[in-house]
Amino acid sequence: MLTFMELAGPTEGDGGGSVDSQLWAACAGSMSSVPPVGAAVYYFPQGHAEQASAAVDLSSARVPPLVPCRVVAVRFMADAESDEVFAKIRLVPLRPGDAVVDVGEAAAAEARREEENSRPRPTSFAKTLTQSDANNGGGFSVPRFCAETIFPELDYSSEPPVQSVCAKDVHGVEWTFRHIYRGTPRRHLLTTGWSPFVNKKQLTAGDSIVFMRDEGGNIHVGLRRAKRGFCSIGGDDESLSSIPGWDQYRGLMRRNATATATGGRTPPKGKVPPENVLTAATRATTGQPFEVLYYPRASTPEFCVRAAAVRTAMAVQWCPGMRFKMAFETEDSSRISWFMGTVAGVQASDPVRWPQSPWRLLQVTWDEPELLQNVKRVCPWLVELVSSMPNLHLPSFSPPRKKPRNPPYAELPLEGQIFTGPVFPPNPMAHDHHHHHGFPFLPFPDSSAQPAGIQGARHAQFASPFPEFHIGNLQPNLMLYAGIRLPPADRAAPAPRPPRIIISTDLTIGSPGKPDDAACSPSSGGKKIDDTKPRGFLLFGQAILTEEQIKNGNSDGRPASPNWDAEKAPNTSEGSDSGVTQGSPTKNTTPSWSLPYFGGNNISRASEYELNPGQCKVFVESETVGRSLDLSALSSFEELYACLSDMFSIGSDELRSHLVYRSPAGEVKHAGDEPFCAFVKSARKLRILTDAGSDNLGD
C-alpha cells in the first residue's frame, strides 16, 4: 500500500507543504469532501477534464467513462500565490475481480470521522469582502459573531477596547492585526496590519476571508477566491442585482454550473494543466497508479466519487418529471440551502465521446431559475429524489388518478399510463480494457458491441422505452388486449419482420401481413393488394415517404404514393380520444392501426373499441386517456354518479350537469336524457366537461 511518504517530495505545482486538514476544510467549504485513504471511488475523466485550464483531447487514449479505483494517498495543499486550497489524490485502478468496496483503512477513517463529529468542531467564519473591506488603506469590518467567538475576548472596560490578533495563513505565515471596537454605532474593526495583508494577498471585492479557531485556541486565516465572470450569461451581474437575495446566492452555481453553448460540454475554466489530465486518464486506462489535483472551489463537482454513492444513485430509473432537491452553499458558506427541481431529460452530456457516462446525466429545471440559471445538468448522486412520479397537469376540479390495476400482461402498459421515457433499465457494459469492470448501473447500452453502421444512429436507442414492443413479437391475445386485431396466423401471408411500433401521437403504421378480411378494398372492386408495393407511413395526416419510394417515383416525376390516400380517407365514425385507429381503406389500401391511448383518428363503436356490450370509456375533457367502466353492473343514474364520483373525486351534483355522451346516431346528449336501460345500450364514450355549457367530446 502506498503511503504519504511516497508523495513527500513536492512536485511541480505543489505550491509547498501540506495544509492543516481543518483549515483546508474550512477554506474548501462545508459541501466539499475528499475520499479517505482506502476508499473505493469511481474516477470520471470527463469531470477531471472540466477542471483543466484548456481543452483536453482524450480521443486518442480510448478513455472509458469511469474507472474504479482505490484511494491510496491524500495530501491537502494550497497554492503558493493565491492561497487557494486543493488536494492531491493518488489512485490505483482496481484489477478485474476486485470488489469495488472500501477497505479497512477507509472504514477506520469513517470511524475517526464519526468520532471527530461527536467532538466540538473548530469554530470558523467566512465573510465576503465588500469594496470597503478590500480598499487599500482601509480597514476590515468584523462581524460580531466572528469577533466574539473566534477572536480573543476584548476588554470592554478600556476606552476604546483594543487588542492585537495573531493569525496564521495556510502556509504557516503569521499575520498581526489590530482589533478595535469603535464608531457610531460601535462595531469591530481590523485596522493596523490589514492593508499589508490585502496588498500581499491581492484581495478584491467578492473574495472571501475565513477565520478559524482550533482546539488549542490558535487563530488561522484562509481565503476563497471569487469566480469572476461566471454567474452571468454573456455579461456582468448587474442585470441580476434586482433579484432579492442575489448577492447572498451569487455563488450558488459555483460547483455545478454548465454551459449550453458548447453542446452540453462544460468549457474549461479550471487550473489543472491539460497535460496532467491526459496523463492521469491514460494511466487510469492502462491500469497504472496516477495522481489527480482536485480544486474544491472550482466550478465542477468532485470527479472522484465514492463508489457506493454512484451505485445508489444509478439504481434509480431516472425519467423526466421526477422531482428532486439539491443542496447548495452560499459563496461565503454561511449556510446551505436546498433547491427544488424537476428532471427534464435523461441523456449523456457528451453522447459522442462518452455515450455511456452517467456524468451530468440529468437535464434539470428549477423552481427558482433566477438563482440557478446556469445549472442545466447535474450528476445523479448530487441530488436527493423527492418524488419518482412525474407531475400530472389535471383540471382544477379533477384530483390525481386512482392507483391503476396491474394489467394481465406485463408486456403492455397500464391502462391510462403515459410513456414518459426514456427509462433506462440496468445495462451491463463490457469494455476491452483489462481493468474495466462490468457496470450494471450504466444508463445506456454499450455501443462498442454494435456494428459500425449502427453506432452512427445511437438516437434510435431513445425511440421507445420498450425496445421489445414489436407487433411480430406479441401474441394475438396480447394485441387484442391492446385493442389491435391481428389476422390468424394460418391466414396471414409470410412477411418480413414488421417495423417497430413507435409510440407517437397520430402515427399510423402499415400492416405487416395480408389479412383476408381486409385484402380487398371496397372501392377497388375486390382487387388484391399488391404485395410488392412498399409500405407507407402517415404522420399527423401527412404521407411520409421512404427512400425506396422516392427512388421509385412515378413517371410524371411525383414520388410513388403510399398504400392509402391520407387526404381522402374519412373517419369511419365520430372520433374518440382513446381507441384504435383503423384507417378507412380507399383505392389500393392496406389495413393500418395505431396504438391505443395515444390519439389518432379513433372510432367509438364497441366492436372497434373491443368493448363488450354495456362497457364504455370515461374521459375528462382535457384528457386523452380514458378509463373503462362497466355500465351493465349499474342499475341507475344515481349509481353511475356515485361510481364516477369515487373514480374522479367529483361531487355527484356537479356530475349531473357535466356528464355527456354520444348516441349511435351521433347526437350529443346529457346523462339522464333517456332511460337508463337505453343509455347502457347506446353509451360507449362518456366525457366529464370542465364547462357545463360545452358539448365538446374532443372530436
Curated annotation (Swiss-Prot):
SUPFAM superfamilies: DNA-binding pseudobarrel domain. One of its GO terms (biological process) is regulation of DNA-templated transcription. The keyword Nucleus applies. Its main location: nucleus. One of its GO terms (cellular component) is nucleus. Residues 110-119 have a biased composition (Basic and acidic residues). Residues 108-136, 505-533, 551-595 are annotated as: Disordered. Keywords: Auxin signaling pathway, DNA-binding, Nucleus, Transcription, Transcription regulation. InterPro entries: ARF_dom, ARF_plant, B3_DNA-bd, DNA-bd_pseudobarrel_sf, PB1-like. Residues 125-135, 570-593 have a biased composition (Polar residues). Residues 125-227 bind DNA. Homodimers and heterodimers. GO terms for molecular function: DNA binding. Interactions between auxin response factors (ARFs) and Aux/IAA proteins occur through their C-terminal dimerization domains III and IV. It comes from the Eukaryota. It is found in: Nucleus. Pfam families: ARF_AD, B3. It comes from Oryza sativa subsp. japonica. The keyword DNA-binding applies. This is Auxin response factor 10. Belongs to the ARF family. Residues 613-693 form the PB1 domain. Auxin response factors (ARFs) are transcriptional factors that bind specifically to the DNA sequence 5'-TGTCTC-3' found in the auxin-responsive promoter elements (AuxREs). Expressed in roots, culms, leaves and young panicles.
